[in-house]
Amino acid sequence: MENITDGKWGSLPVKLHDNILQTLKELGFTYMTPVQSACIPLFMSNKDVAAEAVTGSGKTLAFVIPALEILLKREEKLKKMQVGALIITPTRELAMQISEVMGRFLQGFPQFTQILLIGGSNPIEDVEKLKTQGANIIIATPGRLEDMFRRKADGLDLATAVKSLDVLVLDEADRLLDMGFEASLNTILGYLPKQRRTGLFSATQTQELEKLVRAGLRNPVRITVKEKGVAASSVQKTPAKLSNYYTMCRAEEKFNTLVAFLRQHKHEKQLVFFSTCACVEYFGKALEVLVKNVSIHCIHGKMKHKRNKIFADFRALKSGILVCTDVMARGIDIPEVNWVLQYDPPSSASSFVHRCGRTARIGNQGNALVFLLPMEESYVNFLSINQKCPLQSFSSVKDVVDVLPKLKAMALGDRAMFEKGMRAFVSYVQAYAKHECSLIFRIKDLDFAALARGFALLRLPKMPELRGKTFPDFKAEAIDTDTIRFKDKNREKQRQKWLAEQKEKEVPLRKNFIKNKAWSKQKIKKDRKKKRLPKAKLDQDSDAAEEDLNELMNDTRLLKKLKKGKITEEDFDKQMSSTDKHKPAGIDSSDGD
């Protein structure tokens, strides 16, 4: 099904409950989006649905509304410990967002209860909440949900609770697989009844996703929703009201350009994407100092417990900056994001589309800007062809000033900042080496000296990619970096204590040093082969031991036959000597007399 047009909710071929229509009115959703008008009637008429739609097209309501309608039409009312709907999504931020939307609709249906099962919270608390309050609707991430199914020893029988399941939704299904949740999903699907309605929603279609469709859905209706007004021959994968730009700048000017842009748009809401967690930590801290009078938040995948609060705080802001990795790239709906800035291009082309989709959501206007090095210019043409995502050149950012000396001063004044910068540089280079578009993002063409200047490094780190090379264009600061102290007195005290201990022991710091090696596929294959060798040797040794045992048993049998008179001494000597001939050199079967 394609090219579904949008319209008012009353134009649907199925009737929605009055309370649902009232909530839609309160939320300001007067018109349906194409994906909603396509999916809701099919889902409500007991069809399995596999929907592909551009990011920001309103997929959440396309499954929340029919899920509620299906539960309302049940002949038997759900009991406290019966789960009627299960929604699985890849990230906790997206799960929180869906739970928030579901909560608004459940205000009109007090007979239903929901629970949010995500990482970053105490699983024991989740178990107790489920046991005492129950839940008719579960919104969860795969890891935590799988954990709950295994909590029978704690008195939670979730496997029995889901036997009443009517609706299963896999949201951002392509990313569920990308993030390695396939095994968890298969485990979860094993607990669920076959007689259910299943909806699978994604922004892209992959071969792995097709396998999941075949495994989890029964004769699904496939829906591909295209942006209104886009020709079938060139389906644009980003929202129609998104203005997509790129800007070219040298490595040492890149951060200066970003700071100037953020200063000029400080009254707007902006997302800034970096390629690694270490880059978020470093540049996020720098932006807090360099961009004044703006609320700046940082979020990345290694933050386990803080992420939920940071995400909620930023969503509530009218303006501000969220510095993040791709943990925020999919499905997250943050109100009124004006700009999505991609300081580092993502590791895959499809991620580029999803990052851009954090703005211009559900028909709103939005802008996206990617920062490219001169050597990366061909990426613009690649995106246009590969992802149907055309980019316009952005007029140069004005009032760019050199903030790198200030960044260096921050590193000189606090060892924490110095170490963050070094880690950020190393992680960036490693991420660049593993980029999916390696024909465009070539590590061998990277100007390491210019890059280090752009990171405001005091010296170059020791890493495999730089070994044996000289960089006359990079001038290290004339300072012993070991003398840079932590601003945090406790951390500095611990460092000094550690240094004193090392001196007392007089153990060379490099004694246990393991030489770093550059990442490569060939290296990984060699390592795997090495790991297999000891196992092969062990199997060989095991075979040899078994052979020795068989020979010993054979000798014992011959000796018994001799004692019982079944063979002569001559026969015995002959058979024993023939056995010795087959033994490896160095093995003596005599008694040693």
Swiss-Prot record:
**Could you tell me which SUPFAM superfamilies the record lists for this protein?**
P-loop containing nucleoside triphosphate hydrolases (SSF52540)
Location, primary (coarse class): nucleus
Region called Important for nuclear localization, residue ranges: 531-560
Catalyzed chemical reaction(s) = ATP + H2O = ADP + phosphate + H(+)
Pfam hit, one:
Helicase_C
Annotated localization: Nucleus, Nucleoplasm
Q: Where is the composition biased (Basic residues)?
A: 524-535
UniProt short sequence motif DEAD box, positions renumbered to this chain: 171-174
Any stretches that span the bilayer, and where are they?
Answer: none
Which GO molecular-function terms appear in the entry?
Answer: ATP binding; ATP hydrolysis activity; RNA binding; RNA helicase activity
* Domain Helicase ATP-binding residue range list: 40-223
- Binding residues for ATP: A53, V54, T55, G56, S57, G58, K59, T60
Where is the segment annotated Disordered? 524-545, 569-593
Q: Which UniProt keywords apply?
A: ATP-binding, Coiled coil, Developmental protein, Helicase, Hydrolase, Nucleotide-binding, Nucleus, Ribosome biogenesis, RNA-binding, rRNA processing, rRNA-binding
Cite the domain annotation text. Answer: The Q motif is unique to and characteristic of the DEAD box family of RNA helicases and controls ATP binding and hydrolysis. The C-terminal region is required for DDX55 nuclear import and association with pre-ribosomal complexes.
Q: Which family does it belong to?
A: Belongs to the DEAD box helicase family. DDX55/SPB4 subfamily.
Q: How does it assemble?
A: Interacts with 28S rRNA. Interacts with double-stranded RNA substrates in vitro; the interaction stimulates ATPase activity.
This protein's name: ATP-dependent RNA helicase DDX55
Phylogenetic lineage:
Eukaryota, Metazoa, Chordata, Craniata, Vertebrata
The coding gene here is ddx55
